[in-house]
Amino acid sequence: MAQTSAVEKNKRREKLVKRHAVKRARLKAIVMDQGLPLEERFRATIRLAELPRNSAKVRIRNRCEVSGRPRGYYRKLKMSRIALRQLGSLGQIPGVVKSSW
């Protein structure tokens, strides 16, 4: 089980990303637009830098929804390899069967 504080910190980051997503996207579009004057693009860069660091999507860590584990994460299932194995062995994930050959 992951530390509760780490899981909660990641949840706070997700909320911040959601709150600032539109503003951040608008500013990034201005910065990347080569047709705009350099001064306007520079001002947009400064305003982008003033946003909270944790409002960047890059700062979010994929975590297992069962255990909170940050490593060995399967994106499709949103869980770690360990949780997948445990729940798969118990038959709680539809369509997952133990392999044998």
From Swiss-Prot:
Molecular functions per Gene Ontology: rRNA binding; structural constituent of ribosome
Gene Ontology biological-process entries: translation
Entry keyword set: Ribonucleoprotein, Ribosomal protein, RNA-binding, rRNA-binding
InterPro entries: Ribosomal_uS14, Ribosomal_uS14_bac/plastid, Ribosomal_uS14_CS
GO CC terms, sorted: cytoplasm; small ribosomal subunit
Similarity comment: Belongs to the universal ribosomal protein uS14 family.
Quaternary structure and partners: Part of the 30S ribosomal subunit. Contacts proteins S3 and S10.
Role of this protein: Binds 16S rRNA, required for the assembly of 30S particles and may also be responsible for determining the conformation of the 16S rRNA at the A site.
Protein name: Small ribosomal subunit protein uS14
Species annotation: Brucella abortus (strain 2308)
